[in-house]
Amino acid sequence: MSIPWLFEINLHPEGPPIQMGTRSLGKRPWLIEDSEKIPELTLKKTLSQNPDAHVFETLENTKEAAEHVIKLFQERDRKLVNGGYHPLERAGLSVQEDLCLIHKRAEGWVLAAASLCFPSRWKLNEKIGRNMSAVHGPVEGYQETLEKKVNIFFDRLGPDPVWRRNWFVHPDDSLYQPDRPVGGDPIIPSSDIREKLFVRSERQ
């Protein structure tokens, strides 16, 4: 997105801190539109037509919660795409943001459904139905530092919206990045950093 999001994150030379960093959304908008809306929605539509992209997945019994998302969109006068979509997929194809539903089940808080066109090195079809610890398994330090805090956060989460930002540095500015580089990231010479490294951030 082309909004001045860079000022919303705390960049550290040693990398992103391992913390939740949640804040009250307050009067900030939940859904954002910017100059990249048309190309990003076009990319979402293209990805949704490719079954191998796995940009929408759902467990059973998620439609009621997804219909609530549709209602929230309608209350905000958001234009929704037409078609015979699952309501969460319909909502996801209508906005620039990706959308995930987290449900409390016997195994904890699980990823129950998602319209995820812009993953950052993870595959939705491998994570659907898994609890938060399993979803974040590759995140270094998650289980030791964040697992308990995240579960408590979801247990206590009320109707008032909260938000956070994460950030990464990748040698690729593609929005759709489901794969981790084989053998790790390439070594970028210092002379090429400005052209070949990109700060990627997700507003959650």
Regions found by a protein language model. Give the residues of each.
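Extended, well-ordered protein cores
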Residues: 1-204
